[in-house]
Amino acid sequence: MRWSPPLRLRGSGPGWAAQEPTWREARPGLVAGALKRATTRPSGNWYVVGASRDVRVGERPYGRTVGGTEVVLWRTQGGGLRAGSGVCPHLGAPLRDSRVVCGTLVCHWHGLALDGAPFAGWQPFPVHDDGLLVWVRLDEVGGEKPTDRPVVPVRPARGGAVDAVFTAVGRCEPQDVVANRLDPWHGSWFHPYSFIDLSVVREPEGDGDDAFVVDVSFRVAGRLVVPVRAEFTAPGPRTVVMRITDGEGASSVVETHATPLTRPDHERPRTAVVEATVAASDRPGFALARAVAPVLRPLMRRTAGRLWVDDLAYAERRWALRSTGRFPG
């Protein structure tokens, strides 16, 4: 196979103000249709609560509120994952602030000990660790037919990839986050520091081929760019996956998971964005990137964080307009 450089030197293309407007292509009905199909797909009541690395053996428990339900997670001495109500059944202590002793969760108020089995009114929740993200099944929150496992997107093999997980919280609902990701046309206008020369080459055609296909160049520095083709799909009601299908890093994915923190009827909803990036490459030099993955992960999170400053503003604005009957889409 002929070698090609991973970076390209972009020619004198149009600047931000001179690029082709995309508002005609970004038809509100098209985005709304893709969103409706996504949000009606089953989830089995599974919610992403964080990165697998957030819950470690021998460390303090990890807490998250999902749909108004407090959840606590911890690991046994053998690395097994446990999850359940974050409220102590004795007097309501926040178990996320308790301690793990020899794999047992011990309440810091009165010493009630939980090994993960039902006890004294405390109930465990089904939990799944896919190797990168941790999922909890909350049947009362989801209200769907439960499934044994969540729908985990196909990812590059972990041994040949570098991954990072970024988390942020916004004042909006999950659908506002999903709608943002199902609007690829905003990329080079709203994020000119990261994307350029973006064009949507194929729109969704329904459930049989429900994907946006996008040609875009990622900015590296100055005129140096990485051109790729990417596909956006929504395998579940709170998940959007961007997968590079052609170009540098083919098979790499960015999974965006939107987890509601508040009840569905909350006047000021809050949603956690948990975004997992799994980068892969068949170039021999990528082995070096894997070797220094601990150094790269903070940089990957910083890149995601910069984008989500803007995208959460988009999602929060969308919710603010929807909640007051002013959203034009």
Write out the residue ranges for each language-model feature.
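Rieske [2Fe-2S] iron-sulfur-binding domain
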Residues: 50-155
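C-terminal catalytic domain of Rieske-type non-heme iron oxygenases
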Residues: 149-329
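Short Pro/Gly-enriched beta-strand edge/turn motifs at strand-loop
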Residues: 43-57, 109, 181-184, 237-241
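Tryptophan-centered short beta-strand motifs
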Residues: 43-46, 81, 160
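Short beta-strand-initiation
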Residues: 44, 57-59, 69, 122, ...
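A short, structural micro-pattern
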Residues: 43, 121, 128-130, 252, ...
